[in-house]
Amino acid sequence: MIKDILNRYGKYMILGLILVSLPTLQSMGLIRSGTLQSFGTIIFYGIVALGLNVLLGYSGLISLGTAGFMGFGAYMSAFLTMEMGWPFILSMAASVLLPTAIGVLVGLVSLRLSGMYLAIATLAVAEIFRRMFEEFSFITRGFRGMSSEFPSFFGIQFERDQTFVFMVLLLVGLMVLTDNFIHSSVGRALLTMRASEAAAQAMGINLLKYKLTAFSIATAYAALGGILYAHFVRHTSPEVWNLMLSLQILAVIVIGGLKTIMGPIVGSLVVFGIPAIILPRLPVIGGVPGLAMVFNGILVVVVILFYPNGLVNIVYDIKKLVLFIVGKGKGKEKVAK
């Protein structure tokens, strides 16, 4: 049984162990403080992309409202903890549940659409949220934004390193949860619906029910990512939650790999990690404004043209190549004997 668990979830555990070690490496001076901050960004955007991948990768539905629901979760959690004095656990639960409930209501209307019409409808919802963040200044502080603090649990105030480890544990837990969901009967129904809605209906699958399920998961993950953003970055403002962010998260799952669990994490590392950690240190071009956008745009085109299955599959292809070469070498040895 343990062997089966390790075979299925071992890669998620290894990822978690690597990430958990980063605060220790930073305290030893082996990595920079800014690098740890960048990996925090990779984690919460990876969580958001994991939810969007359920919607797009497994259900075939596209949403451009991701940033709006992230912002909703971020603002709500910051307001409840800083202004209302709620414990972090309660504010996190409420800040996931309310955006998810709103997402279900939005889905009841918008999920009767498909393709670009659905994308435009979800984009409109995100823009409504963004305008609310700007105009409802008596709650959101308008363009100044809202400040928040690292989370606290049962009276224990976390600092940045403890918050980072908490986010890693959440990430690994959600990867395991999503893996189980995808391999459940609901996950199989989503894949059937993605392949052919007509065939799914013929099999008795309630399309609206399963579309709402996928949409609510994507919304919940987006809200959770926004909460983690608010309490790790410790500030949220309207200009963060724009269309560009939704497109970047969409790029994450395209680059990382659709219909995979590790793909969103790989994509988040590439889309958010490389521009923050590596590109600024490049000679000559490192300080060019907009370099990250150019890099991500080129990479999306390259991946779509030459590696449509996503960068996460490179590891498996390299493994196959090595096994092929090793096997070929052994074959030659036998012939020589």
Residue ranges, per PLM feature:
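Transmembrane alpha-helices and adjacent helix-loop boundaries
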Residues: 1-337
